[in-house]
Amino acid sequence: MLSVKQELLAALAGELEKLSPGSAGRAAFESPKVAAHGDFACTAAMQLAKPLKLNPRALGEQLKAALEATPAFARWVDAIEIAGPGFLNIRLKAAAKQEIVREVLSAGDRFGYQKDNGQRVLVEFVSANPTGPLHVGHGRQAALGDAICNLFSTQGWSVHREFYYNDAGVQIDTLTKSTQLRARGFKPGDECWPTDPENPASKTFYNGDYIQDIANDFLAKKTVKADDREFTANGDVEDYDNIRQFAVAYLRNEQDKDLQAFNLHFDQYYLESSLYTSGRVEATVNRLVEKGHTYEQDGALWLKSTDYGDDKDRVMRKKDGTYTYFVPDVAYHIAKWERGFAKVVNIQGTDHHGTIARVRAGLQAADVGIPQGYPDYVLHTMVRVVKGGKEVKIGKRAGSYVTLRDLIEWTSKDAVRFFLLSRKPDTEYTFDVDLAVAQNNDNPVYYVQYAHARIQSVLRAWAEAGGGDVASLKDVDLSALEGPQAQALMLQLAKYPEMLTAAAEGEAPHDVTFYLRDLAASYHSYYDAERILVDDEAVKRARLALVAATAQVLHNGLKVLGVDAPARM
Protein backbone atom coordinates (compact mmCIF):
# COMPACT_ATOMS: atom_id res chain seq x y z
CA MET A 1 0.00 0.00 0.00
CA LEU A 2 2.97 2.31 0.48
CA SER A 3 3.77 1.91 -3.20
CA VAL A 4 0.07 2.42 -3.94
CA LYS A 5 0.08 5.68 -2.01
CA GLN A 6 3.15 6.88 -3.90
CA GLU A 7 1.44 6.08 -7.21
CA LEU A 8 -1.62 8.04 -6.19
CA LEU A 9 0.43 10.99 -4.94
CA ALA A 10 2.37 11.06 -8.21
CA ALA A 11 -0.89 11.13 -10.15
CA LEU A 12 -2.23 13.89 -7.89
CA ALA A 13 0.95 15.93 -8.35
CA GLY A 14 0.65 15.63 -12.11
CA GLU A 15 -2.94 16.84 -12.18
CA LEU A 16 -2.20 19.72 -9.79
CA GLU A 17 0.65 20.82 -12.03
CA LYS A 18 -1.74 20.89 -14.99
CA LEU A 19 -4.26 22.97 -13.05
CA SER A 20 -1.66 25.41 -11.72
CA PRO A 21 2.00 25.20 -12.80
CA GLY A 22 4.28 24.96 -9.77
CA SER A 23 1.61 23.38 -7.57
CA ALA A 24 2.81 19.77 -7.71
CA GLY A 25 4.37 20.24 -4.27
CA ARG A 26 0.90 20.58 -2.78
CA ALA A 27 0.22 16.91 -3.44
CA ALA A 28 -0.49 15.38 -0.04
CA PHE A 29 -2.96 13.12 1.70
CA GLU A 30 -4.29 13.40 5.22
CA SER A 31 -5.87 10.68 7.32
CA PRO A 32 -9.58 11.43 7.86
CA LYS A 33 -10.55 11.70 11.51
CA VAL A 34 -13.74 9.75 10.80
CA ALA A 35 -13.33 6.35 9.13
CA ALA A 36 -16.62 6.76 7.24
CA HIS A 37 -15.08 9.67 5.33
CA GLY A 38 -12.71 7.39 3.46
CA ASP A 39 -9.09 6.33 3.62
CA PHE A 40 -7.34 9.51 2.41
CA ALA A 41 -8.39 13.16 2.38
CA CYS A 42 -7.05 15.83 0.03
CA THR A 43 -7.37 19.60 0.60
CA ALA A 44 -5.58 20.74 -2.58
CA ALA A 45 -8.75 22.18 -4.17
CA MET A 46 -9.29 24.50 -1.21
CA GLN A 47 -5.63 25.54 -1.23
CA LEU A 48 -5.65 26.40 -4.95
CA ALA A 49 -9.11 27.96 -5.17
CA LYS A 50 -8.05 31.44 -4.06
CA PRO A 51 -4.96 31.86 -6.29
CA LEU A 52 -6.93 30.43 -9.25
CA LYS A 53 -9.97 32.59 -8.37
CA LEU A 54 -12.28 29.59 -8.52
CA ASN A 55 -14.97 28.20 -6.26
CA PRO A 56 -13.22 25.50 -4.15
CA ARG A 57 -16.04 22.98 -4.53
CA ALA A 58 -16.17 23.52 -8.30
CA LEU A 59 -12.40 23.13 -8.45
CA GLY A 60 -12.76 19.98 -6.38
CA GLU A 61 -15.18 18.55 -8.94
CA GLN A 62 -12.73 19.39 -11.71
CA LEU A 63 -9.84 17.75 -9.86
CA LYS A 64 -11.99 14.71 -9.03
CA ALA A 65 -12.79 14.12 -12.69
CA ALA A 66 -9.15 14.51 -13.68
CA LEU A 67 -7.94 12.06 -11.03
CA GLU A 68 -10.55 9.44 -11.90
CA ALA A 69 -9.18 9.43 -15.44
CA THR A 70 -5.63 8.57 -14.35
CA PRO A 71 -4.45 4.93 -14.49
CA ALA A 72 -3.37 4.96 -10.83
CA PHE A 73 -6.73 6.16 -9.48
CA ALA A 74 -8.63 3.88 -11.86
CA ARG A 75 -6.65 0.91 -10.57
CA TRP A 76 -6.59 1.55 -6.83
CA VAL A 77 -9.45 3.91 -5.91
CA ASP A 78 -13.02 2.78 -5.38
CA ALA A 79 -14.54 6.25 -5.08
CA ILE A 80 -13.75 9.96 -4.70
CA GLU A 81 -16.33 12.07 -2.90
CA ILE A 82 -16.56 15.85 -2.59
CA ALA A 83 -17.34 16.98 0.94
CA GLY A 84 -17.89 20.36 2.56
CA PRO A 85 -16.23 23.32 0.85
CA GLY A 86 -14.02 21.15 -1.36
CA PHE A 87 -12.51 18.22 0.53
CA LEU A 88 -11.72 15.20 -1.62
CA ASN A 89 -12.42 12.05 0.38
CA ILE A 90 -10.75 9.07 -1.28
CA ARG A 91 -11.90 5.52 -0.69
CA LEU A 92 -9.46 2.78 -1.69
CA LYS A 93 -10.28 -0.57 -3.21
CA ALA A 94 -9.66 -3.55 -0.97
CA ALA A 95 -6.83 -4.65 -3.27
CA ALA A 96 -4.96 -1.40 -2.57
CA LYS A 97 -5.00 -2.02 1.17
CA GLN A 98 -4.02 -5.64 0.72
CA GLU A 99 -0.71 -4.58 -0.83
CA ILE A 100 0.58 -3.53 2.60
CA VAL A 101 0.52 -7.16 3.76
CA ARG A 102 2.93 -8.15 0.97
CA GLU A 103 5.16 -5.15 1.67
CA VAL A 104 5.45 -5.99 5.37
CA LEU A 105 6.13 -9.69 4.84
CA SER A 106 8.67 -8.91 2.12
CA ALA A 107 10.60 -6.33 4.19
CA GLY A 108 10.40 -8.21 7.50
CA ASP A 109 12.56 -6.66 10.21
CA ARG A 110 13.46 -3.81 7.84
CA PHE A 111 9.88 -2.71 7.29
CA GLY A 112 9.72 1.00 8.07
CA TYR A 113 13.45 1.54 7.53
CA GLN A 114 14.73 4.14 5.08
CA LYS A 115 17.90 3.96 3.01
CA ASP A 116 21.25 5.00 4.51
CA ASN A 117 21.36 8.81 4.37
CA GLY A 118 25.13 9.01 4.77
CA GLN A 119 24.87 11.23 7.87
CA ARG A 120 26.03 10.79 11.45
CA VAL A 121 24.29 11.80 14.65
CA LEU A 122 25.61 11.75 18.22
CA VAL A 123 23.06 11.28 20.98
CA GLU A 124 24.30 11.99 24.49
CA PHE A 125 22.15 10.70 27.33
CA VAL A 126 22.10 9.46 30.93
CA SER A 127 25.46 11.18 31.63
CA ALA A 128 25.05 10.69 35.37
CA ASN A 129 27.53 11.77 38.00
CA PRO A 130 29.45 8.75 39.35
CA THR A 131 28.13 9.43 42.84
CA GLY A 132 25.35 6.89 43.22
CA PRO A 133 23.10 4.36 41.51
CA LEU A 134 21.02 5.55 38.57
CA HIS A 135 17.68 6.92 39.69
CA VAL A 136 14.30 6.74 37.95
CA GLY A 137 14.93 10.07 36.22
CA HIS A 138 18.05 8.58 34.68
CA GLY A 139 15.84 5.68 33.63
CA ARG A 140 13.49 7.99 31.76
CA GLN A 141 16.50 9.56 30.08
CA ALA A 142 17.94 6.14 29.22
CA ALA A 143 14.68 4.97 27.66
CA LEU A 144 14.30 8.22 25.72
CA GLY A 145 17.87 8.28 24.47
CA ASP A 146 17.93 4.68 23.34
CA ALA A 147 14.56 4.93 21.59
CA ILE A 148 15.54 8.16 19.84
CA CYS A 149 18.74 6.47 18.67
CA ASN A 150 16.69 3.59 17.31
CA LEU A 151 14.35 6.01 15.55
CA PHE A 152 17.29 7.73 13.89
CA SER A 153 18.58 4.33 12.77
CA THR A 154 15.27 3.59 11.04
CA GLN A 155 15.72 6.79 9.03
CA GLY A 156 19.17 5.89 7.74
CA TRP A 157 21.36 7.76 10.23
CA SER A 158 24.63 6.36 11.54
CA VAL A 159 24.05 6.69 15.29
CA HIS A 160 26.67 7.18 18.02
CA ARG A 161 25.49 6.67 21.63
CA GLU A 162 27.56 8.62 24.15
CA PHE A 163 27.65 8.86 27.96
CA TYR A 164 29.37 11.99 29.30
CA TYR A 165 30.95 11.05 32.58
CA ASN A 166 30.97 13.93 35.08
CA ASP A 167 34.05 12.83 37.00
CA ALA A 168 35.61 16.23 37.65
CA GLY A 169 33.08 18.12 39.75
CA VAL A 170 32.59 18.92 43.43
CA GLN A 171 30.27 15.90 43.72
CA ILE A 172 33.28 13.62 43.43
CA ASP A 173 34.87 15.30 46.44
CA THR A 174 31.62 14.84 48.37
CA LEU A 175 31.56 11.16 47.39
CA THR A 176 35.16 10.71 48.47
CA LYS A 177 34.68 12.43 51.82
CA SER A 178 31.48 10.48 52.50
CA THR A 179 33.26 7.20 51.77
CA GLN A 180 36.25 8.20 53.90
CA LEU A 181 34.02 8.97 56.90
CA ARG A 182 32.20 5.64 56.52
CA ALA A 183 35.56 3.85 56.29
CA ARG A 184 36.55 5.51 59.57
CA GLY A 185 33.45 4.09 61.23
CA PHE A 186 31.16 7.11 61.18
CA LYS A 187 27.63 7.21 59.80
CA PRO A 188 24.91 9.75 58.98
CA GLY A 189 23.48 11.26 62.13
CA ASP A 190 26.79 11.26 63.99
CA GLU A 191 27.90 14.66 65.25
CA CYS A 192 30.88 14.64 62.90
CA TRP A 193 28.71 14.03 59.83
CA PRO A 194 28.81 17.31 57.87
CA THR A 195 25.75 19.51 57.49
CA ASP A 196 25.02 22.61 55.49
CA PRO A 197 25.65 25.54 57.90
CA GLU A 198 22.82 27.50 56.24
CA ASN A 199 20.44 24.56 56.57
CA PRO A 200 21.49 22.33 59.49
CA ALA A 201 18.67 19.87 58.83
CA SER A 202 20.19 19.11 55.44
CA LYS A 203 23.03 16.58 55.31
CA THR A 204 25.44 17.63 52.60
CA PHE A 205 27.17 14.25 52.30
CA TYR A 206 25.77 11.12 50.64
CA ASN A 207 23.83 9.04 53.15
CA GLY A 208 22.74 5.97 51.20
CA ASP A 209 23.71 2.49 52.33
CA TYR A 210 25.70 2.09 49.12
CA ILE A 211 28.34 4.42 50.61
CA GLN A 212 28.89 1.92 53.42
CA ASP A 213 29.21 -0.84 50.82
CA ILE A 214 31.93 1.15 49.04
CA ALA A 215 33.75 1.76 52.33
CA ASN A 216 33.58 -1.93 53.29
CA ASP A 217 35.03 -3.03 49.96
CA PHE A 218 37.70 -0.34 50.17
CA LEU A 219 38.80 -1.58 53.59
CA ALA A 220 38.81 -5.15 52.21
CA LYS A 221 41.19 -3.97 49.45
CA LYS A 222 38.93 -5.27 46.74
CA THR A 223 39.29 -4.78 43.01
CA VAL A 224 36.45 -3.35 40.96
CA LYS A 225 36.17 -3.39 37.19
CA ALA A 226 33.96 -1.06 35.20
CA ASP A 227 33.41 -0.60 31.49
CA ASP A 228 36.40 1.71 31.12
CA ARG A 229 38.58 1.08 34.17
CA GLU A 230 39.80 -1.33 36.84
CA PHE A 231 41.04 -0.29 40.26
CA THR A 232 42.25 -1.98 43.45
CA ALA A 233 41.81 -0.34 46.85
CA ASN A 234 44.75 -0.13 49.24
CA GLY A 235 42.56 0.08 52.38
CA ASP A 236 44.34 3.19 53.72
CA VAL A 237 41.66 5.54 55.07
CA GLU A 238 44.14 8.43 54.93
CA ASP A 239 44.84 7.96 51.21
CA TYR A 240 42.27 10.38 49.84
CA ASP A 241 43.18 9.90 46.17
CA ASN A 242 43.00 6.11 46.47
CA ILE A 243 39.56 6.36 48.07
CA ARG A 244 38.48 8.73 45.31
CA GLN A 245 39.59 6.48 42.47
CA PHE A 246 38.12 3.38 44.10
CA ALA A 247 34.75 5.04 44.84
CA VAL A 248 34.43 6.32 41.28
CA ALA A 249 35.36 2.92 39.82
CA TYR A 250 32.94 1.19 42.21
CA LEU A 251 30.03 3.38 41.18
CA ARG A 252 30.98 3.13 37.52
CA ASN A 253 30.62 -0.63 38.00
CA GLU A 254 27.26 -0.17 39.74
CA GLN A 255 25.97 2.07 36.97
CA ASP A 256 27.18 -0.46 34.40
CA LYS A 257 25.00 -3.05 36.15
CA ASP A 258 22.05 -0.64 36.05
CA LEU A 259 22.54 -0.13 32.31
CA GLN A 260 22.95 -3.85 31.69
CA ALA A 261 19.69 -4.54 33.54
CA PHE A 262 18.10 -2.04 31.14
CA ASN A 263 19.80 -3.70 28.16
CA LEU A 264 21.47 -0.42 27.24
CA HIS A 265 24.88 -0.12 25.61
CA PHE A 266 26.95 2.94 24.74
CA ASP A 267 29.48 3.39 21.97
CA GLN A 268 31.63 5.71 24.07
CA TYR A 269 32.09 6.99 27.60
CA TYR A 270 33.53 10.50 27.42
CA LEU A 271 35.25 11.64 30.62
CA GLU A 272 34.82 15.23 31.77
CA SER A 273 38.25 14.98 33.37
CA SER A 274 39.79 14.37 29.94
CA LEU A 275 38.72 17.86 28.89
CA TYR A 276 41.04 19.23 31.57
CA THR A 277 43.95 16.82 31.17
CA SER A 278 43.94 17.28 27.38
CA GLY A 279 43.94 21.06 27.72
CA ARG A 280 40.61 21.46 25.91
CA VAL A 281 39.00 23.56 28.64
CA GLU A 282 41.94 25.95 28.82
CA ALA A 283 42.14 26.16 25.02
CA THR A 284 38.42 26.97 24.81
CA VAL A 285 38.72 29.76 27.37
CA ASN A 286 41.80 31.18 25.63
CA ARG A 287 39.96 31.19 22.29
CA LEU A 288 37.01 33.07 23.75
CA VAL A 289 39.39 35.62 25.29
CA GLU A 290 41.30 36.02 22.01
CA LYS A 291 38.05 36.52 20.11
CA GLY A 292 37.18 39.42 22.42
CA HIS A 293 34.05 37.84 23.85
CA THR A 294 35.07 38.01 27.53
CA TYR A 295 35.81 40.61 30.18
CA GLU A 296 37.08 40.64 33.76
CA GLN A 297 35.01 41.98 36.61
CA ASP A 298 35.24 41.52 40.39
CA GLY A 299 38.17 39.15 39.94
CA ALA A 300 36.20 36.79 37.70
CA LEU A 301 36.27 36.14 33.94
CA TRP A 302 32.90 36.66 32.24
CA LEU A 303 31.52 35.58 28.85
CA LYS A 304 29.55 38.20 26.92
CA SER A 305 26.79 35.68 26.45
CA THR A 306 24.11 38.38 26.08
CA ASP A 307 25.64 39.08 22.66
CA TYR A 308 24.34 35.66 21.65
CA GLY A 309 20.84 35.64 23.08
CA ASP A 310 21.43 34.78 26.75
CA ASP A 311 19.50 36.81 29.31
CA LYS A 312 22.69 37.85 31.14
CA ASP A 313 26.45 37.49 30.92
CA ARG A 314 27.93 34.42 32.62
CA VAL A 315 30.92 33.84 34.83
CA MET A 316 33.41 31.47 33.22
CA ARG A 317 36.26 31.51 35.72
CA LYS A 318 35.57 32.31 39.35
CA LYS A 319 37.76 34.33 41.71
CA ASP A 320 39.41 31.16 43.02
CA GLY A 321 40.51 30.19 39.51
CA THR A 322 38.06 27.32 39.05
CA TYR A 323 35.71 27.16 36.08
CA THR A 324 31.93 27.23 36.23
CA TYR A 325 30.25 24.07 35.02
CA PHE A 326 29.15 25.35 31.60
CA VAL A 327 32.75 25.99 30.47
CA PRO A 328 33.69 22.29 30.11
CA ASP A 329 30.30 21.82 28.42
CA VAL A 330 31.33 24.31 25.74
CA ALA A 331 34.69 22.56 25.33
CA TYR A 332 32.91 19.20 25.12
CA HIS A 333 30.57 20.34 22.36
CA ILE A 334 33.40 21.80 20.36
CA ALA A 335 34.97 18.33 20.62
CA LYS A 336 31.73 16.78 19.36
CA TRP A 337 31.77 19.12 16.37
CA GLU A 338 35.42 18.43 15.63
CA ARG A 339 34.72 14.69 15.68
CA GLY A 340 32.46 15.22 12.69
CA PHE A 341 29.02 15.24 14.31
CA ALA A 342 27.07 17.96 12.54
CA LYS A 343 23.93 16.77 14.35
CA VAL A 344 24.01 16.31 18.12
CA VAL A 345 21.08 15.60 20.43
CA ASN A 346 21.37 15.94 24.21
CA ILE A 347 18.78 14.24 26.44
CA GLN A 348 18.63 16.09 29.76
CA GLY A 349 16.33 16.85 32.65
CA THR A 350 14.30 20.05 32.59
CA ASP A 351 16.45 21.30 35.47
CA HIS A 352 19.20 21.81 32.86
CA HIS A 353 17.06 24.21 30.83
CA GLY A 354 19.02 27.22 32.04
CA THR A 355 22.29 25.91 30.64
CA ILE A 356 21.11 25.73 27.03
CA ALA A 357 21.44 29.44 26.19
CA ARG A 358 24.88 29.80 27.78
CA VAL A 359 26.30 26.68 26.11
CA ARG A 360 25.01 27.77 22.71
CA ALA A 361 26.33 31.29 23.35
CA GLY A 362 29.77 29.89 24.14
CA LEU A 363 29.74 27.81 20.96
CA GLN A 364 28.81 30.81 18.81
CA ALA A 365 31.39 33.02 20.50
CA ALA A 366 34.10 30.39 19.89
CA ASP A 367 33.53 30.90 16.15
CA VAL A 368 34.56 27.43 14.99
CA GLY A 369 31.83 27.04 12.36
CA ILE A 370 29.12 25.59 14.60
CA PRO A 371 25.63 26.65 13.41
CA GLN A 372 23.14 28.42 15.64
CA GLY A 373 20.84 26.10 17.56
CA TYR A 374 23.57 23.46 18.00
CA PRO A 375 23.11 21.08 19.78
CA ASP A 376 19.48 19.91 19.87
CA TYR A 377 17.98 19.27 23.31
CA VAL A 378 15.24 16.92 24.46
CA LEU A 379 14.26 17.84 28.01
CA HIS A 380 12.31 15.54 30.31
CA THR A 381 10.65 15.92 33.68
CA MET A 382 11.29 13.69 36.65
CA VAL A 383 9.18 10.64 37.48
CA ARG A 384 6.91 10.09 40.46
CA VAL A 385 6.67 6.44 41.58
CA VAL A 386 3.46 5.08 43.12
CA LYS A 387 3.09 1.64 44.69
CA GLY A 388 -0.01 0.41 46.51
CA GLY A 389 -1.59 3.81 45.92
CA LYS A 390 1.16 5.64 47.80
CA GLU A 391 4.13 7.57 46.53
CA VAL A 392 7.49 5.82 46.98
CA LYS A 393 10.38 8.19 47.61
CA ILE A 394 12.98 5.90 49.16
CA GLY A 395 14.50 2.82 47.58
CA LYS A 396 16.47 0.00 49.12
CA ARG A 397 19.77 0.83 47.42
CA ALA A 398 20.18 4.60 47.41
CA GLY A 399 18.40 5.30 50.67
CA SER A 400 17.09 8.68 49.53
CA TYR A 401 15.53 7.89 46.16
CA VAL A 402 14.11 5.08 44.02
CA THR A 403 16.73 3.67 41.69
CA LEU A 404 16.30 2.44 38.16
CA ARG A 405 17.20 -1.07 39.29
CA ASP A 406 14.59 -0.91 42.07
CA LEU A 407 11.95 -0.20 39.44
CA ILE A 408 13.17 -2.97 37.12
CA GLU A 409 13.15 -5.48 40.00
CA TRP A 410 9.63 -4.44 41.04
CA THR A 411 8.28 -4.72 37.49
CA SER A 412 10.41 -5.60 34.44
CA LYS A 413 12.78 -4.02 31.96
CA ASP A 414 10.04 -3.99 29.32
CA ALA A 415 7.46 -2.35 31.57
CA VAL A 416 9.90 0.35 32.69
CA ARG A 417 10.93 1.19 29.14
CA PHE A 418 7.40 1.24 27.71
CA PHE A 419 5.89 3.18 30.61
CA LEU A 420 8.66 5.81 30.67
CA LEU A 421 8.20 6.36 26.93
CA SER A 422 4.41 6.52 26.98
CA ARG A 423 4.19 10.28 27.54
CA LYS A 424 5.83 13.31 25.98
CA PRO A 425 9.21 13.86 27.70
CA ASP A 426 8.32 17.29 29.07
CA THR A 427 5.11 16.13 30.77
CA GLU A 428 4.96 15.00 34.37
CA TYR A 429 4.68 11.24 34.71
CA THR A 430 3.56 8.97 37.51
CA PHE A 431 4.86 5.41 37.28
CA ASP A 432 2.25 3.08 38.78
CA VAL A 433 4.10 -0.07 39.86
CA ASP A 434 0.88 -2.03 40.39
CA LEU A 435 -0.34 -1.20 36.89
CA ALA A 436 3.03 -2.15 35.40
CA VAL A 437 2.74 -5.71 36.71
CA ALA A 438 -0.99 -6.12 36.01
CA GLN A 439 -1.87 -8.73 33.40
CA ASN A 440 -4.86 -6.99 31.88
CA ASN A 441 -5.72 -4.56 29.11
CA ASP A 442 -5.21 -1.54 31.37
CA ASN A 443 -1.48 -2.26 31.30
CA PRO A 444 -0.32 -0.85 27.94
CA VAL A 445 2.83 -2.93 27.58
CA TYR A 446 0.93 -6.12 28.46
CA TYR A 447 -1.79 -5.17 25.97
CA VAL A 448 0.71 -4.72 23.11
CA GLN A 449 2.88 -7.71 23.97
CA TYR A 450 -0.19 -9.92 24.38
CA ALA A 451 -1.31 -9.02 20.85
CA HIS A 452 2.05 -10.25 19.53
CA ALA A 453 1.98 -13.41 21.64
CA ARG A 454 -1.61 -14.09 20.60
CA ILE A 455 -0.62 -13.98 16.93
CA GLN A 456 2.38 -16.24 17.52
CA SER A 457 0.06 -18.74 19.20
CA VAL A 458 -2.13 -18.82 16.08
CA LEU A 459 0.89 -19.22 13.78
CA ARG A 460 2.24 -22.05 15.95
CA ALA A 461 -1.08 -23.87 15.88
CA TRP A 462 -1.15 -23.59 12.08
CA ALA A 463 2.45 -24.80 11.73
CA GLU A 464 1.92 -27.71 14.13
CA ALA A 465 -1.05 -28.79 12.01
CA GLY A 466 1.26 -29.02 9.01
CA GLY A 467 0.35 -25.64 7.56
CA GLY A 468 3.81 -24.22 6.90
CA ASP A 469 5.76 -21.14 7.92
CA VAL A 470 5.39 -17.37 7.52
CA ALA A 471 7.72 -17.29 4.50
CA SER A 472 5.15 -19.31 2.55
CA LEU A 473 2.54 -16.58 3.08
CA LYS A 474 4.31 -13.82 1.14
CA ASP A 475 2.57 -14.48 -2.17
CA VAL A 476 -0.83 -15.78 -1.12
CA ASP A 477 -4.08 -14.52 -2.63
CA LEU A 478 -5.30 -11.74 -0.31
CA SER A 479 -8.63 -11.06 -1.97
CA ALA A 480 -10.48 -12.63 0.96
CA LEU A 481 -9.41 -9.72 3.21
CA GLU A 482 -12.48 -7.58 2.62
CA GLY A 483 -14.16 -7.30 6.03
CA PRO A 484 -14.20 -3.89 7.79
CA GLN A 485 -11.95 -5.05 10.64
CA ALA A 486 -9.42 -6.52 8.20
CA GLN A 487 -9.35 -3.33 6.16
CA ALA A 488 -8.98 -1.18 9.28
CA LEU A 489 -6.06 -3.35 10.39
CA MET A 490 -4.36 -3.04 7.01
CA LEU A 491 -4.74 0.75 7.07
CA GLN A 492 -3.16 0.79 10.52
CA LEU A 493 -0.20 -1.27 9.27
CA ALA A 494 0.29 1.20 6.42
CA LYS A 495 0.70 4.10 8.86
CA TYR A 496 3.81 2.61 10.47
CA PRO A 497 6.59 3.95 8.17
CA GLU A 498 5.25 7.52 8.13
CA MET A 499 4.74 7.39 11.89
CA LEU A 500 8.39 6.36 12.31
CA THR A 501 9.60 9.20 10.12
CA ALA A 502 7.53 11.77 12.01
CA ALA A 503 8.62 10.37 15.38
CA ALA A 504 12.28 10.54 14.36
CA GLU A 505 11.96 14.08 13.05
CA GLY A 506 10.18 15.15 16.22
CA GLU A 507 12.46 13.09 18.50
CA ALA A 508 9.20 11.74 19.92
CA PRO A 509 9.27 8.02 20.81
CA HIS A 510 5.97 8.39 22.65
CA ASP A 511 4.38 8.41 19.19
CA VAL A 512 5.55 4.81 18.78
CA THR A 513 3.83 3.74 22.01
CA PHE A 514 0.58 5.39 20.89
CA TYR A 515 0.80 3.70 17.50
CA LEU A 516 1.46 0.26 18.97
CA ARG A 517 -1.52 0.53 21.29
CA ASP A 518 -3.73 1.48 18.33
CA LEU A 519 -2.32 -1.39 16.25
CA ALA A 520 -2.90 -3.87 19.08
CA ALA A 521 -6.47 -2.59 19.43
CA SER A 522 -7.04 -3.04 15.68
CA TYR A 523 -5.70 -6.58 15.87
CA HIS A 524 -7.79 -7.54 18.89
CA SER A 525 -10.90 -6.20 17.09
CA TYR A 526 -10.04 -8.21 14.00
CA TYR A 527 -9.36 -11.37 16.03
CA ASP A 528 -12.71 -11.04 17.78
CA ALA A 529 -14.54 -10.49 14.46
CA GLU A 530 -13.07 -13.23 12.27
CA ARG A 531 -11.78 -16.73 12.92
CA ILE A 532 -8.37 -17.18 11.40
CA LEU A 533 -7.89 -20.95 11.26
CA VAL A 534 -10.98 -21.68 9.16
CA ASP A 535 -11.54 -24.69 6.88
CA ASP A 536 -11.39 -22.70 3.63
CA GLU A 537 -7.68 -22.87 2.76
CA ALA A 538 -7.57 -19.68 0.67
CA VAL A 539 -9.35 -17.63 3.32
CA LYS A 540 -7.21 -19.12 6.08
CA ARG A 541 -3.93 -18.33 4.33
CA ALA A 542 -5.02 -14.77 3.55
CA ARG A 543 -5.94 -14.18 7.19
CA LEU A 544 -2.72 -15.79 8.39
CA ALA A 545 -0.74 -13.46 6.11
CA LEU A 546 -2.50 -10.46 7.63
CA VAL A 547 -1.87 -11.49 11.23
CA ALA A 548 1.74 -12.44 10.43
CA ALA A 549 2.27 -8.95 8.99
CA THR A 550 0.70 -7.49 12.13
CA ALA A 551 3.05 -9.50 14.35
CA GLN A 552 5.99 -8.24 12.28
CA VAL A 553 5.05 -4.59 12.75
CA LEU A 554 4.39 -5.09 16.46
CA HIS A 555 7.83 -6.70 16.74
CA ASN A 556 9.49 -3.89 14.79
CA GLY A 557 7.83 -1.16 16.83
CA LEU A 558 8.63 -2.77 20.17
CA LYS A 559 12.24 -3.16 19.06
CA VAL A 560 12.45 0.60 18.47
CA LEU A 561 11.43 1.06 22.11
CA GLY A 562 13.90 -1.56 23.34
CA VAL A 563 11.02 -3.80 24.45
CA ASP A 564 10.82 -7.54 23.79
CA ALA A 565 8.10 -9.08 21.62
CA PRO A 566 7.34 -12.38 23.42
CA ALA A 567 6.11 -15.41 21.51
CA ARG A 568 4.37 -16.75 24.61
CA MET A 569 2.75 -15.10 27.62
Swiss-Prot record:
Q: List the SMART domains hit by this protein, alphabetically.
A: Arg_tRNA_synt_N, DALR_1
CDD domains per record: Anticodon_Ia_Arg, ArgRS_core
What is the catalytic activity of this protein?
Answer: tRNA(Arg) + L-arginine + ATP = L-arginyl-tRNA(Arg) + AMP + diphosphate
- The record's EC number reads 6.1.1.19
Instruction: Motif 'HIGH' region — list its residue ranges.
Output: 128-138
Which GO CC terms are listed, alphabetically? cytoplasm
Per UniProt, subcellular location reads as: Cytoplasm
Q: Which InterPro entries match?
A: aa-tRNA-synth_I_CS, Arg-tRNA-ligase, Arg-tRNA-synth_N, Arg-tRNA-synth_N_sf, ArgRS_core, DALR_anticod-bd, Rossmann-like_a/b/a_fold, tRNAsynth_Ia_anticodon-bd
Query: What keywords tag this UniProt record?
Result: Aminoacyl-tRNA synthetase, ATP-binding, Cytoplasm, Ligase, Nucleotide-binding, Protein biosynthesis
The lineage's top-level taxon is Bacteria
User: What GO molecular functions are on record for this protein?
Assistant: arginine-tRNA ligase activity; ATP binding
Could you confirm whether the keyword Protein biosynthesis appears in this record? yes
Q: Name one GO biological process term.
A: arginyl-tRNA aminoacylation
Which top class of enzyme applies to this chain? ligase
- What's the family? Belongs to the class-I aminoacyl-tRNA synthetase family.
Q: How does it assemble?
A: Monomer.
HAMAP family on file: Arg_tRNA_synth (MF_00123)
Q: What is this protein called?
A: Arginine--tRNA ligase
User: What is the originating organism of this protein?
Assistant: Paracidovorax citrulli (strain AAC00-1)
Encoding gene (name): argS
